[in-house]
Design a protein with these regions (language model features):
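FKBP-type peptidyl-prolyl cis-trans isomerases
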Residues: 1-248
Length: 248
C-alpha cells in the first residue's frame, strides 16, 4: 500500500553525503551522538512528513520515494542534486575584501557559515586580504542517501492532532495535552511557553495545519492557564497559647 498526496506519516531517518559518507542530519538521538551531531535543545523524534505537500516537507526526491513505500519498510533512498539541494552555481561564489566582515574578520575560518549582505554562505578561502564566500547550499551538487524507516501512517484525527502539536510546540512530548471531542479540539498551552516569543505564530500554524489535515473539525481552542506565583502562600493560623500554669 502506497501513500496518497496529503498523507501524514512518521519516519525515522539518517542522512549522509554519498561521496564521503558525511552524516549531517538524523531523527535518531543515538545516531546524532554517534556522529557528533547531538544538540541539547533539539527534539529527537520521528519526523512528520506530509506526502506531496509543503506543510511538513522533505527533499523532492525523498518525498517521491516515500510516496511509494508502506508502513514497516526500511530502505535507503538516493536523492540526486536535481531533486535534492540543487546543482552548484558558480555565480553564487563571491570574493570580497576581508575588511567587509568588520569585527568578525579575525574570528572566522574556512568552513564557517557567515551572513553577509543578508545572505548566508560558507567560507571557502581566506588569504591576501580577501575571503571567498560560497552562497550555494552546503550540500548543493551532492547526492544524498537517506537510511529510512517508515514507522506509521497517521489516519485517525487523534493521531494527526497529536503529531502536529509535537512538531509545532517546542516542549517535551510528555507536556503536550489536548482534548478531542466530536468536531472540536481543545489544546492546552504548556506553561513554560506562555510567554515565549512567537507563541501567537505557533498557534496560527497549528490551527492552519489541524484544519487542513483534520477536515471534520470545526473549532480549535487554546487553553492558557496563568498562575500567580507572587501570591503569598497560605500559612496555617497559629493557635493561641494558653497561659502556663505555675504550681506553688
Amino acid at each position: 500500500m502506497t501513500f496518497d498526496k496529503g498523507s501524514l506519516i512518521l519516519v525515522d531517518y539518517t542522512a549522509k553525503v554519498k561521496d564521503d559518507g558525511e552524516v549531517f542530519d538524523t531523527t535518531i538521538e543515538a545516531d546524532a551522538k554517534k556522529h557528533s551531531l547531538h544538540e541539547e535543545n533539539v527534539k529527537y523524534h520521528p519526523k512528520l512528513v506530509s506526502i506531496g505537500e509543503t506543510s511538513y516537507p522533505v527533499l523532492k526526491g525523498f518525498d517521491e520515494a516515500l510516496a511509494k513505500t508502506s508502513v514497516g519498510d526500511k530502505l535507503t533512498v538516493e536523492v540526486t542534486p536535481d531533486k535534492g539541494f540543487g546543482e552548484r552555481d558558480s555565480k553564487k561564489v563571491r570574493m570580497i575584501p576581508i575588511r567587509k566582515l568588520g569585527e568578525d574578520a579575525e574570528k572566522v575560518s574556512v568552513g564557517d557559515t557567515i551572513e553577509v549582505d543578508n545572505k548566508r554562505g560558507t567560507i571557502r578561502y581566506i588569504g591576501s586580504g580577501r575571503v571567498q564566500i560560497d552562497y550555494n547550499h552546503r550540500y548543493a551538487g551532492k547526492t544524498i542517501l537517506f537510511d529510512v524507516n517508515v514507522l506509521k501512517s497517521l489516519d485517525s484525527s487523534n493521531d494527526k492532532v497529536g503529531a502536529i502539536l509535537k512538531e509545532r510546540l517546542p516542549v517535551e512530548d510528555t507536556k503536550i495535552a489536548f482534548d478531542l471531542k466530536d468536531k472540536e479540539v481543545s489544546v492546552t498551552v504548556p506553561e513554560e511557553i506562555l510567554r515565549a516569543d512567537g507563541l501567537q505564530i505557533m498557534k496560527h500554524f497549528i490551527q492552519l495545519d489541524i484544519f487542513k489535515f483534520v477536515k471534520t473539525l470545526e473549532k480549535i481552542s487554546f487553553v492558557e492557564t496563568h498562575i500567580n506565583k507572587q501570591a503569598p502562600a497560605n500559612k496555617p493560623e497559629a493557635k493561641e497559647k494558653t497561659p502556663e500554669q505555675k504550681t506553688v
